[in-house]
């Protein structure tokens, strides 16, 4: 007796169409209570301003006007970025499942070359991690555009826009959005420090190397580099930890402050506040 009321309140689209449940069957109707789908299509779920449908065991997508945007042709169709991006599945050449990306308009964003996709949250939104059959990771944005090709075993955005942390054989490095390698993946750890200029601090064992580009090593020390700052004359200095003590060294390797302090409390205007004992 409340069926009409339920139909007008259940899963309403902005333009007046809505998904309703009629005896357990989902239907897409307009504001005049007319069905917008043919009987051959079964609604599986609503995604954004569309519905995922099934026909003869294959999945596709229909928008809120009843127009087929993704024809039913995929083994599965799953939401990756709601309302924007979806993962489709087909049979690969070897008979194994293969996955690609398609947007809500049915535009194929990537052919089915991948074994898996996962959303990856960042400060600027969602990136999509793509895993290929060679064990490499690529990155796509919310619209399905390529951010980074799958070149390394791990590829993740750094905190600096346009730079990406990479890992190969458990060794870390950095690559730019222009695909130029800033630090080869040869190190135990790599940090990016922005201090007027951008510095890359690579650590291997107890040795630290500072570079500005892949071929421009500006400092190397047996110790861990905590911070970098410039003196008033423009020369670059490094806060270094050696044997659990802290000091300051120039890029020429000269100690301005021998490593003798227990803690560095902060650096202000080129001056270091330290604690001893």
PLM feature spans:
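Residue-level detector of conserved, function-critical positions
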Residues: 1-277
């Amino acid at each position: 007796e409340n069926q009409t009321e339920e139909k007008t309140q259940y899963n309403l689209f902005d333009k007046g169409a809505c998904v309703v449940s009629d005896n357990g069957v989902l239907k897409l109707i307009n504001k005049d209570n007319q069905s917008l789908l043919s009987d051959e299509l079964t609604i599986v779920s609503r995604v954004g301003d569309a519905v995922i449908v099934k026909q003869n065991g294959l999945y596709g997508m229909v928008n809120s006007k009843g127009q087929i945007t993704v024809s039913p042709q995929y083994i599965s169709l799953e939401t990756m970025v709601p309302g924007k991006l979806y993962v489709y599945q087909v049979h690969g050449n070897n008979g194994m499942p293969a996955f690609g990306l398609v947007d809500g308009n049915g535009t194929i964003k990537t052919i089915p070359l991948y074994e898996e996709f996962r959303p990856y949250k960042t400060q600027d939104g969602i990136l999509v991690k793509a895993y290929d059959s060679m064990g490499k990771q690529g990155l796509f944005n919310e619209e399905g555009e390529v951010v980074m090709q799958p070149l390394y075993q791990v590829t993740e955005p750094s905190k600096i826009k346009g730079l990406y942390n990479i890992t190969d054989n458990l060794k870390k490095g950095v690559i730019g959005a222009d695909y130029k390698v800033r630090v080869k993946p040869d190190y135990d750890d790599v940090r990016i420090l922005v201090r007027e200029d951008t510095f890359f601090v690579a650590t291997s064992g107890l040795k630290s190397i500072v570079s500005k580009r892949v071929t421009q090593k500006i400092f190397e020390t047996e110790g861990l580099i905590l911070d970098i700052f410039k003196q008033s004359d423009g020369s670059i200095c490094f806060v270094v930890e050696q044997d659990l003590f802290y000091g300051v060294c120039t890029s020429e390797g000269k100690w301005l402050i021998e490593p003798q302090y227990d803690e560095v409390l902060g650096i202000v205007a080129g001056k270091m506040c330290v604690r001893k004992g």
